Amino acid sequence: MLYYLFQWLDKYDFPGAGMFGYTSFRSLMAIILALLISSIWGDKFINLLKRKQITETQRDASIDPFGVNKVGVPSMGGVIIIFAILIPCLLLGKLNNIYMILMLITTIWLGSLGFADDYIKIFKKDKEGLHGKFKIIGQVGVGLIVGLTLYLSPQVVIRENIEIEKPDGQIEVVHAAKEIKATQTTIPFFKSNNFDYAALVGFMGEHAQTAGWILFVIITIFVVTAVSNGANLNDGMDGMAAGNSAIIGLTLGILAYVSSHIEYAGYLNIMYIPGSEELVIFICAFIGALIGFLWYNAYPAQVFMGDTGSLTIGGIIAVYAIIIHKELLIPILCGIFLVENLSVILQRLYYKAGKRKGVKQRLFKRTPIHDHFRTSMSLIEPGCSVVFTKPDKLFHESKITIRFWIVTIVLAAITIITLKIR
């Protein structure tokens, strides 16, 4: 909104109004404003949650030895993150930009889904919250909206990066002059770092391109669901999900920035995406909101984000990566979320396999995997065998959190470095 106001004022030479025409200025303003909202208004909102007794009431002491200190801590703090993202974007973003619109829809949609889950847990006293099938339906819904919009909107185009060999043998990356709609995505080790989903259905001949888009929509739904649930599982320790997501957000912001500048896109040998510069403003608000929230969520937490926050930030990361055609980098960049998901899935499969044989067995002491590192073998039910019993020494949750942050930083660096490997 302010963007349009200052654009109008600039016509009358209003001092400083021209600054709002620069993406860099609006991005800086977005991160500052989001940080202020989440840190200053966040404190007031936490006090409101305390007065309304919207707090944690149940903690499994067998999993969390520090759980007694967490009972009574306000939950649903994800509302702070959501408002700290939405307000700067609505004020500073171009609201006619299709990418900004999709990110705002994702934030509101998944925020509402997570809010419903937390509401049922806290106010209806149902620890299971929203039924799993309704969560999946909500996640599939946003994935379907994003996938179909990217397919149907004429604003969604790319300029393909092409490698040209010079007479001296050097490789130069240039971008095609024509903007096209394509099912291409960025992936390391492939020619020009591009992979076309349509290539997987090439046997369909003249219908391959349409089939490629259908495949893209299906992959979009899968990625949104997987990453959203991964972030939800990762939110099990003070500061864990907020810190990891901020690091991932910063990496995606760098990729969006270079994708929106044809020269930088050429340097990293990735496609140029016109209009994606508005995504930098969104991700700056996202990072600012998470850092401000982390002020209160770091150990010992004064507030928890709840599913209101975790489902939302996971979905935001997924949709953002899809929009900038970097969804196939998610297994590397969001490796922590992937491992959290896999640990839960493998644990359940292994446990059920043993149950059919009449044997109590587990792969890990506890899942998601971060709980494995703080669970003593003495807490495992008698007669249950565990495959991975190490480490014998238990770690404090703050140490586990910081080490997971470090792993995410390393994965973020690897994600960008792989784009330069040819």
Map each language-model feature to its residues.
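Alpha-helical transmembrane segments
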Residues: 2-44, 83-112, 144-185, 191, ...
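Membrane interface segments of multi-pass transport proteins and intramembrane proteases
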Residues: 18, 121-130
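Membrane-interface helix-loop junction between the first two transmembrane segments
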Residues: 43-61
